[in-house]
Amino acid sequence: MMSIYFWVAIHIFSSFWMIQNIEICDFSRGSLDVALMNNKILIDNNLKEENYNDNNIKHCVIFTKGLEIFTFICPKGNNNDNYKGVEIRPEQCFEKVRINGKEENLKDILKGVVIEKKETDTEIIRKALIPPTIYQDMSFECSCDNSLTIKDNYIGARGIMKVHLKKNIIFGCDFNYDSNEPKLSNGKSAFAQFYDKQVVDSNKNIICNTQVNNKEVYLGLVCPEGYGMYPENCFENVLFEKKVINITELIKHDVKLHIEKNKNISFASFILNPNENPKSFSCHCIKNNDNSFPLIANITFSNYESYSFNFHVTYLILIFILLISYI
């Protein structure tokens, strides 16, 4: 049965969040508790890296190509002596992350990342929707460090969340690429087609054609400031033969969606069968509800395995004809 997964989130981002693929690194369940540690130390020891053993470091490792929600949970100290010195590093985890030992702004690296944070009486919670805009393999870390908590000659443990981002290709169009913005990307983009926003002219239309040649499909559209998506919920609804239809009329598989109307960003993901090629469709970016000069994103399908299939069929037919000719 096909279905579309999304969650209408009521928050400042006014976005759709898919409800599938939720990864949780929860260090609040006692794994860092100073009372559970087995290594006794002297109070006056310096808490250096070499003092740690495997029992002192708890790992949570995640691999992703995007369109997943990550949750990072760290216990609060408050009146609990077992977490008195606990710290999150970087303090604003997901807003800032450690990459190759340096703190970086995640939004400078992943276009379309959405971050939320909240606290309870006992927990600090950070959430991030990781978009599929991963232009190269990389990894980042946040840690929940209870190693500064000392009680009865025991020290707490350190919890490390390590996220491995796998390079992705987004079949779609980014009409709002900023080549002047300081980034780590060095001119790279996960989008198959991208246009510098400095050269996008509101008095000219641009036709962006993207051909999907893989059965694992990530679609994306980014509209410039002052433009809106048409259909409004692009990839939930698409333009097909000049009509707005639901994507499930063309894609007979589960579809994951993330739509940020305020930022004019939309993503979708699904998996095709081998050699399956749905009919083409499109979405537009239109300025001030005027479709005179739209920025058009056309999505066509030429599933990679279909080439292999056709090649082998043609090859077998030729062999068969040659054999017949010799008989």
UniProtKB/Swiss-Prot annotation:
One of its GO terms (cellular component) is cell surface. Pfam families: s48_45. The keyword Glycoprotein applies. This is Surface protein P12p. SMART domains: s48_45. Residues 21-168, 169-304 form the 6-Cys domain. It comes from the Eukaryota. Keywords: Cell membrane, Disulfide bond, Glycoprotein, Malaria, Membrane, Repeat, Signal. Glycans are attached at residues 246, 264, 298. Its main location: other. It comes from Plasmodium berghei (strain Anka). It is found in: Cell surface; Cell membrane.
